[in-house]
Design a protein with these regions (language model features):
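Structured, amphipathic secondary-structure segments that form assembly/contact surfaces
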Residues: 38-144
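Core segments of small alpha/beta cavity-forming domains
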Residues: 1-68
Length: 144
């Protein structure tokens, strides 16, 4: 499953649209890693720049290894700060403690880095009329 545990109150229309763009990205990337069917159209529609390049690379690595993910993804949004009319920085915490990486036969693949929560600052930009995730700045793990 995919759950959003918290979103800040009092967002204006532009902040809300930027946040919806982030959620489109986050849900699309999670579904793509669960299905691993090669269809990245929803990811490509919600992602641009270095974030898209990085996702394609990591997806291909998992696809080549025959891996996919199962479990529950949880997201908390701390803030949505507009940088301009066409860019927002969204402070998020992704709880990946209930996500497992498995082989095509369903065997769990141990993660060398364990299961954690990840805190990121996400740049979302208005691109071709849609809010798309452009880049990430990692703040840390297990701090949210």
């Amino acid at each position: 499953g995919y759950y959003v545990d918290f979103v800040p109150q009092g967002l204006d229309a532009t902040q809300t649209q930027a946040l919806q763009g982030f959620f489109a990205y986050d849900r699309a990337t999670w579904e793509a890693y669960r299905k691993m069917d090669g269809d990245l159209s929803a990811v490509e529609a919600s992602t641009t720049g270095t974030a898209l390049e990085s996702y394609r690379k990591n997806y291909k690595k998992a696809q080549d290894a025959g891996e996919h993910e199962v479990g529950t993804a949880r997201m908390t949004v701390t803030s949505v700060e507009m940088q301009s009319d066409s860019e927002a920085i969204i402070d998020v915490c992704a709880d990946q403690t209930q996500i497992k990486r498995v082989t095509s036969s369903g065997e769990e693949i141990p993660r060398s880095h364990g299961l954690h929560t990840y805190s990121d600052l996400v740049s979302v930009k208005l691109t071709d009329g849609a809010w798309k995730v452009a880049s990430f700045e990692k703040k840390g793990k297990d701090i949210c």
